[in-house]
């Protein structure tokens, strides 16, 4: 077989082996095979290879195993080109060598080479076996996997456990649940690997119930299957389930969690603001054999930032060895969401100046958010324009979202509107919602109504747009307009996303909704709410009832505001913690202007620092003021 130009490399030649073998007495072939397997370096393999070539043993029909052993040895020492060059220099390679070469190409990302080798195998009139297909499937996309699946069936290997597992994995990675399920259901024996691949498939599609059912039915579970299930919960909006499963893993004692487990659990903590649980995981990592590598450190930075403890995030960041771009991005985003815009921009510049790392599209999202939160219009526009001009990064919808938010919050509504119209891509509902929110903030109800009614005409299903339009109508007392929007939502089956606020007390996350009376301490919570209401009124509080969407009497509007979810969470925090201790509240939606005013007053009259994370950013309330400067 001719040598491939792509794989040309410096393998030993006969004429070069004299020196290498002058003091090397050749052992018998069986011993050579053992020596190849035990080789500690590529130099040892090259020396043995040279000796074998000198004695022409590679061509000996009794010793084909030497070729295979050399191929695998080069691959195991990272000399992939040596390994594949050896294959291409072999005359009439057999099935075992073809399979070894396909496997080497596949596991090293040389997908095209793997398929070329498979075609050569078929051209040599050699029938592939189960190991050939298992190796080749590692290089398959869903599309090519379907083609290879037909070959698998042609050669009668459809129910082989190794091949079936490979097929399930290919379909799972491509999100083809139906095909994966068909192969999985036909397997006479389901392996740990195939079951884990199927769980991955369910989890990727957000079907965590099916994933958990299969997970629970497994007789044996390794750490990979645990990780897939925990991460599946965390990535699809079930953070509490993720943490409960993590605790179950620890309680069972085996298998031991690894770095991937910890990162998934930290992600779950980030979503619900479970700071104490996140801190416990940090301590657990330090006391276990889990390495505090850059991935775990980045997970900790993200968790501490999103759970309201920026100081601890900074400490972890400073102690992180060999920071990669993901770690820098996490810290920049942390500064941005807490309103420390100048620190975010400083880090953006330090990252490039000190480390030489180039920013990615994710870096620019955090940096532009920092500009938006601080109203740094000129700086934000300069950074946005530099993406393409200096770094060759094409702006995505998220970057336009930051720019539109920046312009809108600064009151440049027409400019924000023009930016959306001039984009080279279709605007999504998040982008339009940003402009609508800015219209409400700056009182431009004409433009707001125009945009909202245009979007409703496009039949956009985002409930936030309808709610913003309702807010615009309510702000000017147009309750007929509010009722019209509400009826329209009913007709289209659009349900308003409920506001949910959480607070963590003694490692337990407590959840509240507006008007919630299901908490065990509900009586004490409402008593505290009444006390708060009396005290803030004595400090000049006047309810902003324009934020109430219902056409109610003024007293009823005030009562409606008093039981918003964030106020219930704050009240529970006040009765459950020591006087003067800080409170951390997490809300899934933007905090309304009235609750923002009330929280400032509560921080003043109680002498407490209150940290609140809403959909947009963090608010640090201290002594009657907020870190956002009432700009959010």
UniProtKB/Swiss-Prot annotation:
Citing just one GO molecular function, the answer is: RNA binding
Asked if the Swiss-Prot or TrEMBL record annotates the protein with the keyword RNA-binding, the reply is yes
User: Repeats (PPR): which ranges?
Assistant: 94-128, 129-159, 160-194, 196-221, 222-256, 258-292, 293-323, 324-354, 360-395, 396-426
**Region (Type E(+) motif) location:** 507-537
The keyword tRNA-binding is annotated on this UniProt entry: no
One of its GO biological process terms is: mRNA processing
- Tell me the domain of life: Eukaryota
Q: How is the cofactor bound?
A: Binds 2 zinc ions per subunit.
Region Type E motif: which residues? 431-506
Question: Gene3D superfamilies this protein is in?
Answer: Tetratricopeptide repeat domain (1.25.40.10)
- Where, subcellularly, is it found? Plastid, Chloroplast
> What cofactor is this protein dependent on?
Zn(2+)
Residue ranges for the region (Required for function in RNA editing) are 497-512
Record region (Type DYW motif): 538-632
Q: Which GO terms describe its cellular component?
A: chloroplast
* FT transit peptide: 1-19
Q: Which UniProt keywords apply?
A: Chloroplast, Metal-binding, mRNA processing, Plastid, Repeat, RNA-binding, Transit peptide, Zinc
- What NCBIfam families does the entry give? PPR
PANTHER family in UniProt: PENTATRICOPEPTIDE REPEAT-CONTAINING PROTEIN, PENTATRICOPEPTIDE REPEAT-CONTAINING PROTEIN ELI1, CHLOROPLASTIC
The UniProt family comment states:
Belongs to the PPR family. PCMP-H subfamily.
> Its function?
Plays a major role in single RNA editing events in chloroplasts. Acts as a site-recognition transacting factor involved in the edition of the site 5 of ndhB1 and ndhB2 (ndhB1-5 and ndhB2-5 sites corresponding to cytidine-830), which are plastid-encoded subunits of the NADH-plastoquinone oxidoreductase. May provide the catalytic activity for editing site conversion.
Name of this protein: Pentatricopeptide repeat-containing protein ELI1, chloroplastic
The source organism is Arabidopsis thaliana (Mouse-ear cress)
